[in-house]
Amino acid sequence: MSGGYLLDTNIALFAAAAPEMLSRAVRNALKNGPNVLSVIAFWEVVLKSSKGKLDVGDPLEWWENSLNDLAATSLPFRPAHVAAIRGLANIHQDPFDRALIAQAMVEGFTLLTSDELIPKYASARFRVIG
């Protein structure tokens, strides 16, 4: 798999609730696709929802609606993704973002994010649009 756009959790959340918060570059990428949502984003939403830090209603319904609304496919978290985390610099301590970075590297995706730390990882191994 390669050549698509992997959405950071914040992009998936903004796309549904406040698309005006997204940069023009991100909005254009979302229109052009193909778009991919990682189960890592779903996991992050479930955990934040269960702690009362995020209200998306039913997280499973949010996930299914997000896949549909963004015309996105679901990306599982595989052993190759886990292994790629080991080689990442310690720039970012967020385990969800580190997992998404690893997935972008392994799969050849461009990562869509508004996180200011993630572009510091960008290299010839993956691209970032923010």
Language model segments and positions:
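Short, well-structured N-terminal submotif of metal-dependent ribonuclease cores
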Residues: M1-S38, G52-N65, E107, E116, ...
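Generic structural signal for small/hydrophobic residues in well-ordered secondary structure
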Residues: D8-N10, V45, I85, A104
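Alpha-helix capping/helix-boundary segments
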Residues: I11-A12, H81, L100, L117-I118
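Residue-level recognition of specific faces of alpha-helices
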Residues: V39, A84-G87, R98, Q103
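Acidic catalytic patch
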Residues: L60-N90
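Acidic, PIN/NYN-like endoribonuclease modules and their adjacent C-terminal/linker elements
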Residues: I101-G130
